[in-house]
Amino acid sequence: LASAGLTADTIVAAGLGLTGGRHEAIPVVQSLLPAAEVISEGDVVTCLIGARAGRPGVILIAGTGSVAFGINAAGQRADAGGWGYFLGDQGSAYDVGHAAIQAVVKALDGRGPQTTLSPEVFAHLEAPDLKTVYDHYHSGRIARATIAGLAVRVAAQAEQGDYVAQQILARAAEELASMAGAVARRLWPDGESVVVCPVGGLFRAGQPLLDPLRAALSATAPAASLEQPRFPPVLGAVLLALKRLAVPLTDAVFETLGAARDEIAALK
């Protein structure tokens, strides 16, 4: 606040987007900002509000985990996925990385096609062979985040033309489209048009993932279209606060948010 030339009593609203502890956070923030109305939502809500600039739609999140979440014009909400790696996370970076490891196992066993993923998997896991991978995993030296990190190498090999890597991303795209389609059908049962915004690190894979995702989405939810998010989740929290204050979302407001978005991007 000091760096912005503000004091706590000048803040009239604060929006929060949290994974957990939503209700517990409110009194903490209110103690710091006594004049503010504090609005706390789940992080998927502020992610969607930012991505769609406050409009209805669906976000499709694919990072270490995966989930689809949507809000329609009536304010109704629905989600699909988000069950963690044991029960779900299909189409996530973890799922892609795990599939890459399994593909390498099959290739070396002679049960699957050869793939350029083999040296990539061993390099990423810092293991010379499958026996070492096995030992490292069961001794707790390979974390889920490490497996998810393999998705970057899968994307690179898919871009280079490796069939196995391309198929892994195509299967991930089908799973992600299935989640988004399920949400779209529940919130827009009459087949109205809906925008789906892809969010999360896996989408840095680019066209090898986005192309099959568009095709799969067209098959499962023909009225859905894929668009890039307009604002990041942190600005979704700002929009959450503005909406609670009934501030009109004018072009000037969006220009200010756009400038903030660019400043945030420059910090990364």
Outline where the language-model segments fall:
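Phosphate-binding/catalytic loop of phosphoryl-transfer enzymes
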Residues: 13-119, 265-267
